[in-house]
Curated annotation (Swiss-Prot):
Positions of Mg(2+) binding: H8, H67, E116
EC number: 2.5.1.-
Protein's name according to its UniProt entry: Metallothiol transferase FosB
Active-site residue list: E116
GO CC aspect terms: cytoplasm
A Pfam match: Glyoxalase
InterPro entries xrefs: Fosfomycin_Res_Enzymes, Glyas_Bleomycin-R_OHBP_Dase, Glyas_Fos-R_dOase_dom, Metallothiol_Trafse_FosB, VOC
GO biological process: response to antibiotic
Keyword terms: Antibiotic resistance, Cytoplasm, Magnesium, Metal-binding, Transferase
Lineage, uppermost ranks: Bacteria, Bacillati, Bacillota, Bacilli, Bacillales
Family affiliation: Belongs to the fosfomycin resistance protein family. FosB subfamily.
Domain of life where this protein originates: Bacteria
């Protein structure tokens, strides 16, 4: 078996209507279908699904660094920040960052799922780590 890529992303949400508005306005996702407790979007070719599950505890989600990062052009980072701020999105304080590691904006959806807009690539990150973090071990093919 060979993994061919990510098939879809699904998030459990407390309020489907509130989350639909967030994903449409904050991420520009196109709503494809909405049911009583589920919604499907097209997010720049990514299948994004929401399931309304109002009774699931969500306390621990705020303590985790787990997140999904989307690529945004470096020239669009300020516009992305202003868009999120204008929508009243919860923008998180990012970690201290070396300029070689490029820019990021961290934020949450209404249920606390963390997202990042990042303008760097994996190779940018690896090059930076090779220069700045001698304690790391790299495994090249």
């Amino acid at each position: 078996m060979r993994i061919q890529g990510i098939n879809h992303l699904l998030f459990s949400v407390k309020c489907l209507e509130r989350s639909i508005e967030f994903y449409k306005k904050a991420l520009g996702a196109k709503l494809l279908v909405k049911g009583r407790t589920t919604a499907y979007f097209d997010l720049q070719g990514i299948w994004l699904a929401l399931n309304e599950e109002p009774d699931i505890p969500r306390n621990e989600i705020h303590q985790s660094y787990t997140h999904i990062a989307f690529t945004v052009g470096e020239e669009e980072m300020e516009e992305a920040y202003e868009r999120l701020a204008g929508l009243g999105v919860n923008i998180l304080k990012g970690r201290p960052r070396d300029p070689r590691d490029r820019q990021s904006i961290y934020f949450t959806d209404p249920d606390g799922h963390k997202f990042e807009f990042h303008c760097g690539t994996l190779n940018d990150r690896l090059d930076y780590y090779r220069e700045a973090k001698p304690h790391m071990t790299f495994f090249d093919d």
